[in-house]
């Protein structure tokens, strides 16, 4: 989750990949070559997600070029594991065509790429949910309308995709209808998704689905998510 950036000073400043000779596409590719060499024979590795949410890349090093260098490096040592490529501009599903259309030119000799988009329902698409449901003008189809840009792109170019992040707050039950409509749309179009977020570290974070009261009380989002949950080996469910 470093957005195509790296800090050399403990987080005080961040350098973009491709911004200088200190941090190039080849450096990232070298990391992935080594990771693929190490983990290629692990049957529990579903795919290599090469970078989370790149955005505002340096003009001399667009994300599509960096991704191609990484793909080439991985395929030097692993020809089988799927490679997951996030879109540009924070992987936005809504703005996929504007910022990530060029990813369709990526070449994988193994023909095993999965493109990943992210989607949040708030007005500014950020997932911070700073305003209320009413203030952001949410409708039952907000998620579907945003997902269509990505899903239709996948269909148009015969690509495989994943909605790698989506989530709604637990502070208003009305969020559950657009969430469910999104999941129905993804299911009907054969696009899997992974919810953001889960796990005990999130505390009272309003998008989290970690159960409370010693795992005895589910968060409200689970009433929808459980209807669409599948596990490995049951992807058609």
Spans of model-derived segments:
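Short glycine/proline- and charge-enriched loop/turn segments
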Residues: 9-19, 130-135
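Extracellular glycoside hydrolase catalytic/binding regions
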Residues: 23-47, 51-191, 207-226
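Aromatic-lined carbohydrate-binding surfaces of glycoside hydrolases
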Residues: 1-10
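Surface beta-strand/loop "capping" patches
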Residues: 235-237
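Short secondary-structure capping/turn micro-motifs that flank functional sites
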Residues: 4-5, 170-171, 202-203
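Cytosolic regulatory and coupling regions of membrane transport/channel systems
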Residues: 227-232
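Acidic carboxylate-rich catalytic motifs and surrounding loops in phosphoryl-/glycosyl-chemistry enzymes
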Residues: 165-167, 196-200
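Extended hydrophobic/aromatic segments used for targeting, binding, or gating
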Residues: 194-195, 205
